[in-house]
A protein has these predicted regions:
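Sec-dependent signal peptide recognition
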Residues: 1-7
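Ser/Thr-rich, Proline-interspersed low-complexity disordered segments
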Residues: 19-49
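Residue-level signal for mature regions of secreted extracellular proteins and peptides
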Residues: 9-10, 158
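C-terminal motif of bacterial Sec signal peptides marking the signal peptidase cleavage site
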Residues: 12-15
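Flexible, surface-exposed loop/gating regions in the mature catalytic domains
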Residues: 44-305
Length: 305
């Protein structure tokens, strides 16, 4: 993984070169496949960071780490904020990964069909704790169960818990206006089947991110100790590697090679919002080394005599 991180650094340094206002695509550089998936080591659940505010999550589709790391806007974000270089999806196809991200379990599901699961999941947990949240589904023009393409029910995990459409799951058309008003403590964003990269190119998906992410970064909700997490549901390589960005106002570490997965991301969300961890997230390592928390002083070797 050290070689993979160094190779990524070469790509990201290219993105840091002086440029005009428009982003300039760096010269594509092959990036070695990240190491095969290893389970994150169990860790005690830490206390939430002081005064946690808002957490935003964007889930993109079907790209391995190397397929997106060199993209212009993504490389720009990775040079400015945190990037996990040893992060993996937990299953295939899409649905079990979305369920893992929102409940700490794949529920043994290995397809993208509809499954009526018990009520619960992250949304219910937040509601029970009195934390306001909203999930924005791009392309959802009717209810969560009967909206046509390019909306995809399999990318709306909140509809599976209790087989219902929570009131907090809304159309993405509300997103821009909501960001200029009162922003919920937790925000989930699912792009439509084109903008998430599922049916369209990297360039289209990256352009969507370049339009959407600045709307989040411009909010006081993010600027005041907020956290934006961008990940991909599953990779297309044998290791199921995906790139994950950890975007905070004052990051301390740009790259982490620690082994993380979707349970780690859920643990991070729950720790930041101060709620108990669900399912496998209870045993996962949160992405604490990429968060903007006070650094640990370096160890010093004091010689005497």
């Amino acid at each position: 993984m050290r070689f993979a991180a160094l190779a990524l650094s070469a790509v990201l340094l290219a993105a840091c070169a002086p440029k005009s206002a428009a982003y300039i695509s760096p010269t594509p550089t092959p990036i070695p496949t990240p190491a095969a998936q290893s389970q994150p080591s169990p860790s005690p659940q830490p206390s939430p960071t002081p005064d946690p505010t808002h957490v935003f999550v964007i889930v993109m589709e079907n790209r391995s780490f190397a397929q997106v790391a060199g993209n212009s806007y993504i490389a720009h974000l990775a040079t400015q904020y945190g990037v996990a270089t040893n992060y993996h999806g937990v299953s295939h196809p899409s649905l079990p990964n979305y369920l893992a991200l929102t409940s700490g379990s794949t529920w043994g599901i290995a397809d993208d069909g509809f499954h009526a699961l018990p009520a619960g999941g992250l949304g219910s947990e937040l509601s029970a704790a009195g934390i306001d949240w909203r999930a924005y589904m791009e392309g959802m023009t009717r209810t969560c169960f009967n909206s046509p393409y390019p909306y995809a029910l399999k990318h709306d995990p909140f509809a599976y818990y209790g087989a219902s459409c929570p009131a907090q799951v809304v159309a993405f058309s509300r997103f821009a206006s909501d960001m200029s008003g009162t922003v919920p403590r937790f925000v989930w964003i699912t792009p439509d089947l084109c903008h998430d990269g599922h049916d369209c190119s990297n360039a289209v998906a990256e352009s969507w991110l370049a339009q959407t992410v600045p709307l989040i970064l411009a909010t006081p909700a993010w600027q005041d100790n907020g956290l934006l997490l961008i990940t991909w549901d599953e990779g297309e390589d044998s290791a199921n590697s995906v790139l994950t960005l950890v975007i905070q106002p004052n990051p301390l570490l740009h790259q982490s090679s620690r082994p993380y997965n979707h349970y780690s991301l859920l643990a991070t969300i729950e720790d930041e919002l101060g709620v108990p961890r669900l399912g496998e997230a209870a045993q996962a390592s949160p992405m604490s080394d990429l968060l903007a928390t006070p650094p640990v002083p370096p160890l010093r070797h004091n010689q005497t005599g």
